[in-house]
């Protein structure tokens, strides 16, 4: 083979992945006596300005987790439906279809006009679960919740970002996800108590309360932010 035509032998993808992870990178030099963990401060990880949006996320994410945790047991134990995955399929497909329309509504009419109908759709989906009698109810619930959660989630993230200055966006994002984690943890316990004491149907109906409160609080915060931005 002529010298100009030689080529490297084929290598497995793992070799090139290893090269990418071990490639030398330039690391900023630390000052003498400066700790490598010096930048890890609570103020950099948590934004107190975003506490209200965090509380909203506790309520909303807790509800989403409660649906996921208890719906399969409810369908099997009370209705004898073993394969409830069609609910998640309906929610995902409807979210994929509705997301562009919700984005246009958010751009044209603003977050409040998007949040209120999304909250109504989500609450209606929960009530469908509470009154479910067969698989059709779960499909309808998945469609309604798919629309609702894809309208609520972007607005809640927007609120977190708007409550802090530009240099605090990362801390606000961290605070936002902290609320989601707390909500997920609480839902398993509180929802479990509700379902054990009052039954699954009452538990799903009760999940409407935190959703309504979360939407109401979000509307209040957004109204206040818009007023501040107009007067600034």
Region locations from a protein language model:
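A membrane-interface helix-boundary motif in multi-pass transporters
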Residues: 1-10, 193-211
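Conserved extracellular-gate-facing transmembrane-helix segments in secondary transporters
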Residues: 56-68
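Intracellular juxtamembrane helix-capping segments at the cytosolic ends
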Residues: 151-164
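Structural signature of the two symmetry-related core transmembrane helices
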Residues: 9, 113-128, 208
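Juxtamembrane intracellular "pre-TM" segments in multi-pass secondary transporters
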Residues: 22-57
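Helix-to-loop junctions at the C-terminal end of transmembrane segments
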Residues: 98-110, 195-196
